Amino acid sequence: MIKKRFISLSALIVLLLVITGCGKDDDVQEVIYEKGLPKEDSPAFKEFMRYELGLARDATLSYQDHTYTIMRSDVDGLRYYQYTDEELRDFYSPLFSAKKDLSHTLYDLQTTEFLNKEKLIQNKIEHNLPEMTLDKKNVLNVKTKSGEKKIELPSARGKKVILALEAVRKDNMLIQVIINGKTGDSQTYYLFIKQDLSKHQLVKEDGLHTTLESGKLKDYLSVFPKVTEDGAYLKLFDNYIFEEETNKVRKIKDTDILSEDGKYVYINGAKQEENFVISDGIQQIQTVDNYLKGNKKYEAQFKLDFKNISNEMGFKTPGVSSASIHYFNEDYVVLSLSYHGVMVGTAGSVNVLIDLQKNKKQPTAYLVDLGIE
């Protein structure tokens, strides 16, 4: 009798687990598919355009009163620019008026100079931006409103030095220093320096994490963007987060993707199956806080179906040949999908623009070929 009760109870538990599991999956809704671009502009689309036009890849030093201040650094030197939301939106507005060949329209925008001389900041000091110069011996001279400071760079004499201002705050600055040798070798340093020029610290790139964890850079932490309002987490370079409470550098898994702003994680967003294809089905996004705590709280959950997307596009195909996340930021995800032809070749390609601004449980996915691979 006891044995029968035990078997019955076990069967009931298994049944409840199955029902509960199915229920959770059933609660996750598939995205709403729409062909073409969004009908109107939005803050999240604007940030996506900044990325596509190469503006977000430059160091964004500030965004205030609808105005961006950015730094661009290359072999020609270091320059500062300012542009407004309105100027940016006017620049990419042809995308919304184009009736066809959107990929060509985007390409034309990408190959047209947006950062012209009119947007160049001439008086750096007045804009609270440092002037940085190198003498013939590659000694760095930094000039701010507080004065000037000369800093000798290690093993830089006779080599090509590239400077990049990564961040500027009220109290601190962060300068990237790349020293290129004549034989093709290079060494990257990070120069942390006080705005009043009272002190500085130079750290090798490969020693940045250990130096952070040692506490030696405690006075300079403001140069790293806050991931959370309380500053419990700070965004470092690449897929790394600094946790202030534990004084530890945390790494986002290689199979997951950190958003451009460093605040969200796309679970398994970089976990590609065979032939460079990420999985469709349930997609999950967490805040960095929840991700690092290891819980199951999700900021967004929704379903994607690659077959349904091909049907919407009218592709005759046995399935996807490649599928990857091209762009991920707060409230916006952009995928690049390519489909096999029935026998050989390609049936077609499409970009999927998932807009999470209004609905994170059933977002709208815009299907459009922007030529983004």
Describe the residue ranges of each PLM region.
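Bacterial N-terminal signal peptides that target proteins for export
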Residues: I2-L9
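N-terminal "mature head" segments of proteins
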Residues: A11, L15-L153, G158
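Recurrent small/Gly-Pro-centered beta-turn motifs in extracellular repeat architectures
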Residues: K124, L129-T133, I175-I179, N268-G269, ...
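Structural signature of eukaryotic scaffold interfaces centered on beta-propeller domains
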Residues: P43, Y51-G54, T60-S62, Q110-E126, ...
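Hydrophilic extracytoplasmic domains
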Residues: K24-V28, E40-T60, G269-E373
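Short coil turn/linker residues within repeat-based beta-strand modules
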Residues: V139, T144-K149, D196-K199, T246, ...
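Repetitive beta-architecture junctions, highlighting loop-to-beta-strand starts
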Residues: L78, E86, D135-L140, S186-Y190, ...
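Acidic, serine/threonine- and glycine-rich low-complexity intrinsically disordered segments
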Residues: G158-V320
